[in-house]
């Protein structure tokens, strides 16, 4: 059988692509080296932020607004346990923060619902938060967080119900191109398709070593909290920049545990074996202490944590482009630790590619040619 589309990597983007392409009537094969959702990539750990006024640049705003529409649609499949939680997101940092300047600019350009607070205003609204006098907060009322593993599980189930073929726990070892399409080699044999999507995440260079993607080991952890830090008490998800420039992110507490991670830093790795479990690197358990001590002093001890990986591009912007010399193969990689919120729209973009549809978005900033 020759498929219309083969998807290599069925984590966040691949799971979405599998669903949207199958729903569009294509004959699709989803593949993954493991059984998604799993612990081997970048999508585990229960939750991911979704921010609309984007500190990484306004080129992302049209994408994230469409992503939000798709997340809302997906959440309707799980109304008892919604995939998207509109907790709001407070972005904290010095008044001269470049990141916050981008957030404010994005909000202004796209007329987003963002409220600016000074230090006293922040602490009055959320007494659990402490910030210096020179800090401001930009509160995104309509943003919140996503249940990442539930989202992937839901997409995979919906794709299967729609007739998608799924080959999991079966690594792809080779991609070949000819005039007739794309062939992949797996332990289960060869499979052919007219087109392919490569969204293999951290270890995409095992298949395409020429790509400018660097795996980085990252950690996040859950700390002892109480009901003051919960969604029920209107405690928001957050990003926070310390005076030294370190960037943190976190979520409202659930079951008396508040999850937090540090966005910058981490350990450059070159193989899956180097992504050692949480606590095997000395700094893992204390990485969030500077933020907690200064901004959330009421949070208690570290309860547990996890390690994941970022697939970083050189400029930490996404790579969304066809493989050089092979227009039938789309790459979606280099998501650099801020990609999950876009998984829905990136999956839709992949499905449009498979149908020979022109994308509704300007993807020029994400082309591979910018690194030449």
Curated annotation (Swiss-Prot):
FAD binds at residues 4-34. Keywords: FAD, Flavoprotein, Oxidoreductase. Coiled coil: none annotated. SUPFAM superfamilies: FAD-linked reductases, C-terminal domain (SSF54373), FAD/NAD(P)-binding domain (SSF51905). Binds 1 FAD per subunit. Transmembrane segments: none annotated. It is an enzyme of class 1 (oxidoreductase). It catalyses: N(alpha)-methyl-L-tryptophan + O2 + H2O = L-tryptophan + formaldehyde + H2O2. Pfam families: DAO. One of its GO terms (molecular function) is flavin adenine dinucleotide binding. InterPro entries: FAD-dep_OxRdtase, FAD/NAD-bd_sf, Me_Trp_Oxase_MTOX, MTOX. Its cofactor is FAD. The modification S-8alpha-FAD cysteine is found at residue 308. Its EC number is 1.5.3.-. GO terms for cellular component: cytosol. NCBIfam families: PRK11259.1. Catalyzes the oxidative demethylation of N-methyl-L-tryptophan. Belongs to the MSOX/MTOX family. MTOX subfamily. HAMAP family: MTOX. Monomer. This is N-methyl-L-tryptophan oxidase.
